[in-house]
Amino acid sequence: MQVLVGLLALALLGAGPAAPAEPPVVRVKLTTQAGVIVLAIDVKRAPATARNFLAYVDDGRLDGTRFYRASRRKGAPQLGFVQGGIDTDARRRLEPVALEPTSKTGLRHVDGAVSMARYEGVNTGTANFSLMVGASPNMDARPGSPGYAVFGRVVGGMDVVKRILAMPTNPGGDGAMKGQLMTRPVTILSAQRLDGTPHPTGRAKVWLLFRR
């Protein structure tokens, strides 16, 4: 019996301290060519989407990506959203995250909201995200539409977001992006978490080996 107790004690000592829990809100600093934007990522209310985004941040997968879309509202061009992230760069992509609808999280597409972009399929979000300028309730979940996942808010640099929204766009493009692709995309020089402990995935950083 004493031997078993001793072995158990050694096992507990060898296990070391438990990993610290993620803070309920994690701030992320985006340093861009247009200035600094600070996001507050809501780990508590949108845990899957938040952890997915933070994985990209902790891996450095957002460093060198761009804000490439400025979607201005017709009749009120000072409102809309900007979109950025990995775009179609498959070298940076991790597995898609399941949609956490606003009807589940209680988060809404209010002014400054951070929203996960996706393809037509519901569970197709990766690391393209939108920053709201003004409220966009049409992007919330509603009967007949799953909407998009809100997972944070802008807490610093909203003036930078508005400046990006006002930048020139090309008249071309297809579908919803027609006329919204920026003439000169704004590079995200770095994305850095300001709270909690980074949890890199350990995956190969292929985009660093074969730069475009």
Sequence positions of predicted segments:
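Bacterial N-terminal signal peptides
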Residues: 3-14
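Cyclophilin-like peptidyl-prolyl cis-trans isomerases
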Residues: 15-212
